[in-house]
């Protein structure tokens, strides 16, 4: 009995930290970091070794209710960790009257911790960004890629960023209307039913070629299979300019990943849509971030009934970047491709869809082949069956300077009958039957020749199947 009493009176050898001690441990580096910033010391922490003195200072610890005692720190600086240069606006009500704010706007990027930033440049962080508190994100139902307009205030004391005080509009919509928008993943996908017409008054044979051989509909998921030097960049620019000219209701996004800087500049000067790029001299993580920015912005627009087109160059390089950044799965395919690396690009490409009752997301991506890389071939095989439109460029035709170097037999669109009127569809099918009897070079040259001799596809299709007694018999394709 005495032994048990003695053991009960003896303190245990193990020590369990109490709440105050844990609080002290968390605040040590934070206090020193704040002191560094306050002293504007460029050489690091001058307060090393003073942590014990700070902890023993009277009145340092907090009361249970969270209010500081005499000598304690204010709410803004207490327990903020690496966010102590942000600001806490959680107590600001949505209907608070703002009298001295600044009008601002930006694209929202939400962090894993729940807070976010309005980016002036969607793909780059800068000191001009605007901090958005977690309470604002929850109150207004904000999502990644939202275009936010509102009132902000300048940073105070040690704060680094401007702070969002009030949200005036979300994607140019009233706040209450925006709260009712559906979630992209809950929208019902259907086959494309409305064609994106690429033919223009200018003599661009390639655009008329695509309209008849592999039409693109709103909500299409298309792949341009491109060997080196086959003209894919020129083709993408022409597609982009045709979309902006013929369909002003469509929001165009050109996404360039791992491309040459001069090609990025040329695309920005040639295309009227939004060009989002990450050149080859950027880190793979930046490539992935740029792709996320583009797809999230597109989803937000589709949710409110908009038609969006993303032209991606290329899904092959996007997959390469994913292979370098993904957590290794322990398995490796031929060419060094991790099977887990393909999931994120597939999720991007699979987002293309036509939405029932309005809105669509069209993605046309280039896939590189015949590069000499086994990984590129594996990536193409992974995406080959996922698209519902394929346009194959032929290296042999490009080497013979035949443009557009399109392989007619290997190109086409699934359910293209939904994209043509009945009368036009019959002519298109008849055209395909004629071209199917010819070789790759002969069929392409014949179609190019007939297109160049007619002012429009409508006039050209009138020639298809013309009777031998007609005046156009010698020129018909019957």
Task: Go through each PLM region and give its residues.
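P-loop NTP-binding catalytic core
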Residues: 154-224
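Hydrophobic positions on the alpha1 helix immediately C-terminal to the Walker A/P-loop
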Residues: 235, 239
């Amino acid at each position: 009995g005495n032994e048990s009493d003695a053991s009960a009176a003896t303190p245990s050898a193990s020590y369990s930290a109490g709440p105050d001690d844990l609080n002290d441990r968390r605040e040590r580096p934070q206090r020193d970091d704040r002191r560094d910033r306050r002293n504007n010391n460029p050489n690091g922490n001058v307060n090393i070794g003073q942590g014990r003195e700070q902890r023993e200072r009277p009145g340092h610890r907090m009361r249970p209710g969270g209010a500081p005692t005499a000598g304690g720190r204010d709410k803004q600086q207490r327990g903020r960790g690496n966010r102590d240069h942000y600001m806490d606006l959680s107590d600001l009500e949505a209907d608070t009257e703002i009298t001295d704010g600044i009008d601002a706007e930006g694209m929202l990027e939400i962090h894993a911790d729940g807070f976010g930033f309005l980016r002036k440049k969607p793909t780059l962080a800068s000191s001009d960004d605007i901090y958005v508190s977690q309470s604002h994100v929850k109150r207004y139902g904000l999502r990644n890629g939202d275009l936010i307009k509102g009132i902000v205030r300048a940073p105070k004391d040690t704060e680094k960023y401007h702070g969002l005080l009030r949200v005036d509009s979300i994607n140019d919509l009233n706040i209450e209307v925006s709260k009712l928008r559906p979630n992209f993943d809950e929208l019902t996908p259907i086959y494309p039913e409305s064609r994106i017409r690429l033919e223009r008054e200018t003599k661009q044979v390639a655009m008329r070629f695509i309209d008849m051989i592999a039409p693109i509909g709103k909500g299409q998921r298309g792949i341009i299979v491109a060997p080196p030097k086959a003209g894919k960049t020129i083709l993408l620019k022409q597609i982009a300019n045709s979309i902006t000219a013929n369909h002003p209701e469509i929001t165009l996004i050109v996404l360039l990943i791992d491309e040459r800087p001069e090609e990025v500049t040329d695309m920005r000067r040639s295309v009227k849509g939004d060009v989002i790029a990450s050149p080859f001299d950027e880190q793979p993580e930046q490539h992935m971030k740029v792709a996320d920015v583009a797809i999230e912005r597109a989803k937000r627009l589709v949710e409110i009934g908009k038609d969006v087109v993303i032209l991606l160059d290329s899904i092959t390089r996007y997959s390469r970047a994913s292979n370098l950044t993904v957590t290794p799965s322990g398995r490796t395919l031929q060419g060094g491709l991790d099977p887990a690396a393909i999931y994120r690009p597939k999720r991007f490409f699979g987002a293309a869809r036509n939405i029932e009752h309005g809105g669509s997301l069209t993605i046309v991506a280039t896939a590189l082949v015949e590069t000499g890389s086994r990984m590129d071939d594996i990536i193409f095989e992974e995406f080959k069956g996922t698209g519902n439109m394929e346009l194959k460029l032929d290296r042999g035709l490009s080497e013979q300077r035949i443009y557009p170097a399109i392989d007619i037999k290997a190109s086409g669109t699934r359910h293209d009958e939904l994209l043509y009127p009945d009368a036009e569809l019959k002519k298109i099918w008849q055209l395909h039957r004629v071209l199917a009897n010819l070789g790759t070079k002969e069929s392409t040259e014949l179609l190019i020749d007939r297109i160049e001799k007619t002012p429009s596809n409508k006039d050209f299709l009138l020639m298809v199947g013309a009777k031998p007694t007609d005046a156009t018999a010698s020129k018909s394709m019957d």
